[in-house]
Every structure is written in structure tokens, then in C-alpha cells.
């Protein structure tokens, strides 16, 4: 099958799981013998634009004639069987869907976030989950300057999604949601249910797995991810302090891998706490290695995650999760089976779980064994890719009519 992936990469200063998913799937599909190409643009390129071109960005977000023209050329030359769109914001724009329509090529789109209904893409505002725009009315987003703290930037983002609502509904042959909880929260888009599918993100792993029979010397838990409020950095710090206040000095260690807007705050906090180690930004092999050194992985997200690559990465290694009990985490992690869930509004609940992790190592070895089983049964890479190919075949067999 000839497959063209279309993706607008996020800024290099804000590493994205979406970028990783695109790269991993491209490599895997090519390994299976498919002819795969990637049509992409970089958000970083905006910084290099001349002033006059930057001034046109609000209009280009909504309709970029240059990318439509360039993609049309690629479609004529490559003649793919299917186009798989990931992200079109901000450089590509929904104009790419019209290029595909004009070329008569069916489109599959993966919805990685909540951007079509939420200007910030995460249903999170001022430290709390927010569903004010979930019904389809975007005015609260503009009123609250939800995108980059700017009413103008928010209005541009909202205008893009609202003006192309029928584009998303009429020019896409198949929609891929990355969790059932995400599909539920995006119900306000009124997508055709017959063309909507849930497919978890692809996470390949062929490295070492924790040996449940081995003695468990690990007295460490790990956080891997972006350091910001939505990802739960404040909750992590409060929960850790509450735990150490009870446990004292002879207790677990905390390893933190990642960067982000709260890096300086987390660094200052960790400086006074010998039990906390900052590992910085790590590549994928080092992330898996760090997870393997841990008794559990902590996921304290305060926003309702659409997925969570770290969940599956930990399961692949055989390490259980301590995760916030909302969003996709309630779907991915089964409390008491392959991890434990806690109220994201309760740092004391996280502290109690950390006490349990240290006091009951055998229990968490068992949870880790179950986590690995979950990976093998629910997140098997080959089954995941087969599901993706089935959706491609569906799109080819059921193209939307030109309108």
C-alpha cells in the first residue's frame, strides 16, 4: 500500500508525543513493506519567516494556499492509496484536506488532542479541568484568552476550527481517536459514528522486561514527562512532600525526567530534597532504562489525557503505574490489577500510594507482571499496526463523496 503521512511538527522547544508516534508508525509501516512518505512542515520555521509573512500567520492557520499547492504536487507524483493526517496546526492548515479531495485520495485523520473543540487543546484552564467549550460554543475560550494568553491568538484558533467544521465532517473517510474517553469528549463534533474508530497509540518495545522472580531492590519511583501544571508537576511535588513527611529519610527515591515551563521551579524544589534526582531530557532508550530501575511510574496529570505514551512504555517494561483517575488513564490502567489510580485533586492520596509502594514491594512486582500482560494483550505492536491497516483499507473502500 502507498501511504502518505501528513504532519505539522510541534516546536522543538516543546517535545511532543505526536511527533514520536508519526516517526514510529512511519518506520513500522515501511518495515512491513509499505511505500510510505512523509509530507511535513515544522512550526520552528515560523521564527525564520520575514515580518510580512509572520503577519499573515492568522490567515494561513485557516487556509494556507502554499501547502495546498505543495501537497497537490506530492499527491500527483506519489499517487498514494491513502493519506493519513496527524496535525495541521499552525502551518499546514485544513487546506491539505482539499488537496486530497481534489486528487481523489481518501483521508484518515488521527485526533491526538481536543483542539477541534478546545482552543488550548487540553480542556484545562487556570489549574482545573474545563469543559466550557465541549458543546461546540467557543466564546468562553476567546473570553478567557485560552490560547497563549491572547484573545487574538485564541480567536484565530477558534475561527480555524469553526470555519472548517464541515471540512472535518465531510472530507475525512475515517477518524482515529486514541482513547474512548477522548472520543466521548469530542462528541460535540458530531462525527459520523460509522467512520469513527478507537486505536491506541503505537508503542514498540523489544528490550529487557522486569523479572518478577528476581529480588526487587528498587526503591525508586519515576516521573517522565513535561514539567507543567497540566501534567501535574505541582501535584507531584505536593504529594512527594506529604509522603516524605510521613516516611522520613529511609524511604523511596524520586527520579524526574523531562523539561518544560516549570523546570526552574522543580529544580529549585529538588535542590532542597536529596531524595529527588533530576535526570533531564532523555532519549527513548534511556527512558526505558530509567523505567526499568523503578518500582512504579507516577502519572499525576491534572488534565484529562487523551492517551499517555508513558503508560504503555512502563507496561512494556513490566512496571506498574500510579495514575490520576480521569481521562484516558481510567481506561488504560486498571486499579489494583496493573497499577493504582488516585484522585488528581488529592496529593494526600498520592502520598498514601507511595507509602504502599515502599511497604509492599511484592504487591508491586505482581502489578508489574500484570502490566506486562496488559501490554502483550492490549498494546501488542503487530496487532496495533494491523488495526491501522484495516482502517486504511476501510477508508479506501469507503471514500467520502466529493462535495
State what each model feature region is.
Residues 264-285, 289:
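Nucleotide-activated donor-binding/catalytic signature segment of Leloir-type glycosyltransferases, i.e.
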Residues 292-306, 319:
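Acidic donor-binding loop of glycosyltransferase active sites
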Residues 207, 212-241:
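Conserved donor-binding/catalytic core segment of Leloir-type glycosyltransferases
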Residues 181, 202:
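Carbohydrate-associated surface elements
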Residues 349, 356, 363-378, 384-387:
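A short, well-ordered alpha-helix in the C-terminal region of glycosyltransferases
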Residues 335-336, 340-347, 356-361:
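Conserved acidic donor-binding segment of nucleotide-sugar-dependent glycosyltransferases
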Residues 102, 115, 131-174, 184:
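Membrane-proximal helix-turn-helix segments that form the acceptor-binding/catalytic region
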